[in-house]
């Protein structure tokens, strides 16, 4: 994760509008702020936000949403220590330098209400249909809302896998998909005052359970549309990783895998 922050500073003497001040961030070059991931993710712009629990997050918003839609929604919840809205300009300042603070639960609500457009089949890393990716830092030590379950992957997920993930993890539907990391992880509840535990969940397990391939091939015509993908009832002979169908479905098995009881 890049350590460089996008900073916010005080308003100019002319007192430009909130939207103009905030939308100035759109002129930033993503390569300046997220060198590792900007080449992997197709982004229109990036905004870095420091939340109320002092953890740093990168908020990635991909193709489909207009600057006006995003920043008008954020404007009413945009807060600073000084009580006035400041704008993001990407520069380093010696005076009046603060980080923008938005509560995580409020931001989730705002993003869910925005009219996102579906990305094209060729664009990847849009795990949920909202095309929203929230990147968590290397360490998450503060308590968070139990309803927030990040899914993390470094693979280019085929479009049809989005519906499968949402089907298996309904708590993620309309929630947040986290950014690039090794494998898929889901934060294990309950969180409470304890640090969340990230345990690996392999894409291969989901793909096997649905008879799909990791190569990105779409389901065969016999498997029907995305919403009606059927689970295999028998183990494929060329898949030695499992010996029988999982009782209760892959969702129940994964829930047991992610249990806090070892």
Curated annotation (Swiss-Prot):
Segments of this protein annotated with the region Disordered: 219-243
Membrane topology of this protein: Peripheral membrane protein
GO cellular component: host cell endomembrane system; membrane; viral envelope; virion membrane
Presence of the UniProt keyword Membrane in the record: yes
Subunit composition and interactions: Homomultimer. Interacts with nucleoprotein and with the cytoplasmic domain of glycoprotein.
Extra remark: Most abundant protein in the virion.
Function: Plays a major role in assembly and budding of virion. Completely covers the ribonucleoprotein coil and keep it in condensed bullet-shaped form. Inhibits viral transcription and stimulates replication.
Transmembrane segments: none
Molecular function terms from GO: structural constituent of virion
Family: Belongs to the nucleorhabdovirus type-1 matrix protein family.
Subcellular compartments: Virion membrane; Host endomembrane system
Protein's name in the database: Matrix protein
Chief site of localization: virion
Alphabetical UniProt keywords: Apoptosis, Host membrane, Membrane, Viral envelope protein, Viral matrix protein, Virion
